[in-house]
Amino acid sequence: ILATAIWVRDHNPDRFVALVTKDINLRMKSKAVGMVAQDYLTDRVEEVKVETSQKEVHFIDNAPAEVLQELAYSQNNAVDWRAVCHDRPYPNQLFKFKVQNEDTLCARYDADIDKILLVRKREACGIKPRNDEQKFAIDACLNKKIKLVSLTGGAGTGKTLLALASALEQERDYDQIILSRPTVILGNQDIGFLPGDQKNKMSPFLQPLMDNLNVIKAQYRPSSKEYQRLEALVKDEKLLITPLAYIRGRSLGNAYFIIDEAQNLTPHEIKTIITRAGE
């Protein structure tokens, strides 16, 4: 391949010739012999610089005492953003206000009312947040005005658990809760075909999702109504745990859709998932 690319370049001196490959080793060899090589960019997410205020929590440590008082104790727990910001915040932008004793007040900008609202500590299906970041996550997942929530964080930070607990907390408002993840093996190493039907084949991939469901169920006694309700959701397929491989062609209306391990998806797969959403 490399020799062919060099031949084409040498026989077309008036044209720009580059070797396009996703093989990084081949690109290194091309560079060593002076051949221009590029990565295949079509199936790759463009790295666009995101403004800091769009992706991080805005920390304010010098807010006036009267603003903190109004945010924490007023009837609507809301303050005018002009009291703490020079520029209008982005919709659903998150804030942390430093108060005494190293505590913080968590807040979120609501574009509908043009005010900054207090984010209270809420629990979802018995799961309580352990830090401010989890508090923000539950608040976003329980907010029906926010149609798309993206949770990022390290391993074991509770992303899937919080999303699933929030969905189960609102299960009466949706026709179906769909929990899915791509069938990607660690290290992308193929282990061959698995025996059994579709359910048996997908079981190893979907086990992490079942583990999160079992964490929620473990809070209740098997004889309790809550435990029986969760069991019924799975049995009646109102809570459906499924691989992403079978989502093409479906229309998901009035559904709470959770995608786990989304970083393993290609841009084409992300587009396919988004176009499945109904009203």
Describe each PLM feature range.
Residues T4-H11, A32-V36, Y40-D43, K144, ...:
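Conserved, well-folded catalytic cores of nucleic-acid-processing
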Residues K235-K271:
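Conserved RecA-like ASCE ATPase "motif II neighborhood" in helicase/translocase motors
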Residues G156-G158:
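Conserved glycine(s) of the Walker
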Residues K144-S150, N254:
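Pre-Walker A (Motif I) flank of P-loop NTPase domains
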Residues L151-G153, A163:
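Hydrophobic anchor at the beta1->P-loop junction of P-loop NTPases
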Residues L161-R229:
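Conserved P-loop
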Residues I1-A18, K22-K144:
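Feature 3881 marks metal-assisted phosphotransfer/nuclease machinery
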Residues D10-N12, N143, Q170-R172, R248-S251, ...:
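Conserved catalytic network of the ASCE P-loop NTPase/AAA+ motor domain
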